[in-house]
Amino acid sequence: MNRFNPFLGNIDELFKTSEGEKKEYVHPALKNLGSVSLVLIREAIAPVVFRNSEEEITDIEINQGEGNSDLYVRAVPNKFKYPERGRGLQILRLFKAGGKMPQNKIILTKKMKPSDGFDLNSLVFGDSTVWDSNVLPVKAAVNYSDALSVLPKHFCVDATFHHRAFEDGTLFDAESKKNSDNLFNRHFVKPGTLLVQVLSTRGRLLPQMGLDHLLLSIGIAGTYGGQTSVTGTNIRTHIAGIYGGRFEQPETSPYQIVRALANHNNLEAPLFQNVDQLTAHLHETLNKVHEVSMTAQEVRDYQGQLMQRFESDFQSMEADYREAADKIADFFDKWFMGDKADKKAK
């Protein structure tokens, strides 16, 4: 993982002090050239529901050139970011290194400090709150892209017909003395569907500790989308590779990946259904256009080491998290409070 250090931030240099008109002030470290992208393959292992107010699965039309276009399943970033951000909070709570407040509901009183609400999760996934009439914005160091199916939508979705019965198992409403007309379709993404998503960090804002925390938060499998009580764990996540360089490359956009795959002659080829073949195809393309890379197997091994350490070397990892928590707390307090942070610490 050290190969990506030239494109990542430094947890000991999260902020910088500059000279203002009247006095010095603290602000986040200035951005520098550097980009790291995690290319993920999200595999549906049970029915998944990605929808808005309509019952149909969300989609987007992608132009494939020469006047051709098709609809693809589209899961917007928050469908995956929300549960993984939540898992990150749970990890911090276990280590007593953050996660003091619920996700999306940080409330700071005047007597509290920004670090009472902001933590490593805030640095990685972003956060915001209002404190003493000021809006405190923390931009995410990691950006989630849309997740797009590698095959057109009509290959990937299906629907089942349902009715909402009463407790006695019938459709007769005892109150109204009528039959229930509460009938509906449930559209879902079929098991076996593969979606591509890219998580990227730019400007050297994410420290190594943040990347490790992200890998733990992503995990291996989880429950995603709406109406998930129906299917439970429904997504297995595969990291196809990690790629770094001074500049971002257009080839890492999931839209570009899908456009390139659309030119394949046979949409029923194993490439669209087999994670290993798709992973190899993506790595062959992306490795050429980046300065450094880590293969899927290398990432699996590294992620496995993190998981193993989490389970068997808990105290050591807890110490690392708490040390990082102190540095991040100092960063947020000095950024948003300035000199008041030192006075409040005393």
Feature map (PLM): residue ranges:
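RNA-binding basic/glycine-rich loop and surface signature characteristic of RAMP-family CRISPR effectors
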Residues: 1-346
